[in-house]
Swiss-Prot record:
Protein name: Probable tRNA sulfurtransferase
Organism field: Geobacillus sp. (strain WCH70)
Domain of life: Bacteria
SMART domains the UniProt entry points to: THUMP
Keyword Thylakoid listed: no
CDD domains: PPase_ThiI (cd01712), THUMP_ThiI (cd11716)
Family membership: Belongs to the ThiI family.
Record function comment: Catalyzes the ATP-dependent transfer of a sulfur to tRNA to produce 4-thiouridine in position 8 of tRNAs, which functions as a near-UV photosensor. Also catalyzes the transfer of sulfur to the sulfur carrier protein ThiS, forming ThiS-thiocarboxylate. This is a step in the synthesis of thiazole, in the thiamine biosynthesis pathway. The sulfur is donated as persulfide by IscS.
Pfam families associated with the record: ThiI, ThiI_fer, THUMP
């Protein structure tokens, strides 16, 4: 007898009341997309549980993929049997024997959801525990802190038995909270912001500003690689690459140096907002952390935000750099982000940017340069690509040279 299914437990979705089914269906769709290569599996879902029937598929690679699906609180390999005491005892014994159990401790945690079943939880704990003790060597009982917690759940459709919980990433299913545009540079912060936005259920489309010849194709490939890492958590992601050279040059030549950074950020936000409208998103996500750099002071954010009424979401706003780096390492974007390729955020950087800019001044300076035609041209010439887990990486890119 082998584990024949994976039991998935929901997290925050259980608080959603009448809307819960919408979240559960979204999670089911996301799990199905993630596991599309495993053609024999079948997914069954209920209001409070989801099951993946393995049907002979190997569980190890499936478990690895489930660890990155937002909306999953935890999951376990499971066995299902009929609601008959002897069969439950034998199935529980088989589940324990498939684990390293020599010298370990265990307990039984029985739960009788089906109240028609003739044995209560305490009786089940005793009967199953005694059966396991009689038929194993080197296994002892510890009801307070066991090495193995054998969970037995008797439901109307059958009894489910699990022995080990694997933590999921938590959060909400990607797409359950709507869609937002992620302003994605080549740095450390914005990929982390994208990851955290997806954890809150947002589907994201990435927007990157590309300024050739000042930025190279390697910088562009670096951003593609970052998006590819994010597809581990959100599936396919659209990447919009905006040609930004003419806009940046116009700002650099016409706007005073100390205000050029603020004006550049305002232009970026205008373009992102236009793309948001075109692609029917409801918010913009940035990697800003309050006070980290000159453009991320509260005064700067206020002036930059003035160009739109669209909600700006800043998942990193209260984090320090060490916290952000820790997450970047966890999601495997850090080493890509620190590759030494210039992006549009690092070129034309003023020596002494204003940390407390005045809105009236930046509006006055921008009145001397007509940026709107350049912004519209950049939007019209934006390149859009769809990135998935199979897109070419930097290593494959290097083989072209």
């Amino acid at each position: 007898m082998k584990y024949d299914r994976i039991l998935i437990r929901y997290g925050e979705m259980t608080t959603k009341g009448r809307n819960r089914n919408l979240f559960v269906r979204r999670l089911k769709d996301n799990v199905a997309k993630k596991l599309h290569a495993f053609q024999n599996i079948k997914i069954e879902y209920m209001r409070d549980r989801m099951y993946i029937l393995l049907n002979g598929e190997p569980h190890e690679p499936i478990i690895d993929k489930l660890k990155n699906v937002f909306g999953i609180h935890s999951f376990s390999l499971a066995m299902k049997c009929h609601n008959e005491l002897n069969e439950i005892k034998e199935t529980a014994l088989a589940a324990v024997k498939q684990l390293p159990h020599e010298g370990k401790t265990f307990k039984i945690s029985a739960r009788r959801v089906d109240k028609q079943f003739p044995y209560g939880s305490s009786e089940l704990n005793y009967e199953i525990g005694a059966h396991i003790l009689r038929n194993t060597d080197g296994l002892t009982v510890n009801v307070h802190d066991p090495d193995i917690d054998v969970r037995v759940e008797v439901r109307q459709e059958g009894t489910y038995i699990t022995c080990h919980d694997i933590p999921g990433p938590g959060g909400l299913p990607v797409g359950s909270s709507g869609k937002a545009m992620l302003m994605l540079s080549g740095g450390i912060d914005s990929p982390v912001a994208g990851y955290l936005a997806m954890k809150r259920g947002l589907e994201i489309e990435a927007v990157h500003f590309f300024s050739p010849p000042f930025t190279s194709d390697r910088a562009k490939q670096k951003v593609i690689d970052l998006v590819k890492k994010l597809t581990t958590y959100g599936g396919k992601i659209k990447l919009h690459i905006v040609p930004f050279t003419e806009v940046q040059q116009a700002i650099y030549t016409q706007v005073p140096n100390e205000y050029s950074l603020i004006s550049t950020r305002r232009a970026m936000l205008k373009i992102t907002d236009a793309l948001r409208q075109r692609h029917r998103a409801l918010a913009i996500v940035t990697g800003e952390s309050l006070g980290q750099v000159a453009s991320q002071t509260l005064e700067s954010m206020f002036v930059i935000n003035d160009v739109t009424t669209t909600p700006i979401l800043r998942p990193l706003v209260s984090m320090d750099k060490i916290e952000i780096i820790d997450i970047a390492k966890k999601i495997d974007t850090h080493d890509i982000s620190i590759l030494p390729y210039e992006d549009c955020c690092t070129i034309f950087t003023p020596r002494s940017p204003k940390t407390k800019p005045k809105k009236e001044k930046v509006v006055h300076y921008e009145s001397f340069v007509d940026l709107q035609p350049l912004i519209e041209k950049a939007i019209a010439n934006t390149e859009t690509m769809v990135i998935d887990e199979h897109s070419a990486t930097e290593d494959e890119f290097e083989q072209l040279f």
